[in-house]
Amino acid sequence: MSEPLKPRIDFAEPLKEEPTSAFKAQQTFSEAESRTFAPAAIDERPEDEGVAEAAVDAALRPKRSLWRKMVMGGLALFGASVVGQGVQWTMNAWQTQDWVALGGCAAGALIIGAGVGSVVTEWRRLWRLRQRAHERDEARELLHSHSVGKGRAFCEKLAQQAGIDQSHPALQRWYAAIHETQNDREIVGLYAHLVQPVLDAQARREISRFAAESTLMIAVSPLALVDMAFIAWRNLRLINRITTLYGIELGYYSRLRLFRLVLLNIAFAGASELVREVGMDWMSQDLAARLSTRAAQGIGAGLLTARLGIKAMELCRPLPWIDNDKPRLGDFRRQLIGQLKETLQKSKSSPEK
């Protein structure tokens, strides 16, 4: 017997086709194109550094705003009015032979001249800081360029700005390594590997020294007010040292921008609970159990000082970081913990003697 026919089934939605994977067309490179191929570098940063890096970048990098332009315009108009009024007073004093008023006008002219000179000097320092950012962008373009003729002049300008003498061994090795057949990317890359590490090593030593001083001072100091003053002073000194090493001089306005970040660093130095929690993640449970509250605060303040120095070092360098040569907090962390343990052991052994 034949089976009965099944009733028809009506579906409310149309039949969906199964998605098929789309394959891209094969792409082949010729031998000439493969020689000029350069892989793009991926900048991998830890997630926990995002907020802090943005805060330091905003504090160090000069920026323009509408309010600043309005204030500058008002100051310029006020200055022009003062100069015009001073000229009128001088003419009246000369005509009436009022020598006292004429002397006052001369003193005012000297004060105004000193103020104008300070403004020009401050503008020049801010302009130099902006130029360093432009030089870093230019270096990044040269490191991805295959042109010839710009790399050597650019590197010689950087060496002159940094105060590196022509007879310096690192610069002599760079001159011996370059030749006419190399392009700009190779020349700048050789400079980054042979000459730039000389300045970077000095900056690393300064960061290590200042971070160690902050760690030890806070670990042994019983007064919170002394800790805050010491952190503020050493952080500003560290910024000045790093900028001097890379040939940049900060002005008064730039230091005001940095002071905001220094206050943030001071706040971390006084937050003992937060520092202890962060220290538990960074150190083993055994070591954290042996350290006192002051020692944990010292390590936290030292690491924050090192972070500030690393960011200032990054913004003052004329070249971008390449080949993962950027200093890490872990490089300074082990050194700080070792120095702190050694200091605590010495302090425990001295009363026994």
Swiss-Prot record:
- How does the entry describe its membrane topology? Multi-pass membrane protein
Keywords, alphabetical: Cell inner membrane, Cell membrane, Membrane, Transmembrane, Transmembrane helix
The record's annotation in InterPro entries points to: DUF697, UPF0283
Gene Ontology cellular-component annotations:
plasma membrane
Q: Does the keyword Calcium apply?
A: no
| Disulfide links within the chain | none
TM stretches of this protein: 70-90, 100-120, 213-233
Q: Where is this region: Disordered?
A: 1-35
- Answer whether the UniProt record assigns the keyword Nucleotide-binding to this protein: no
**Biased composition annotated in UniProt, kind: Basic and acidic residues:** 1-19
Q: Where in the cell is it found?
A: Cell inner membrane
Family per similarity comment: Belongs to the UPF0283 family.
Q: What is this protein called?
A: UPF0283 membrane protein YcjF
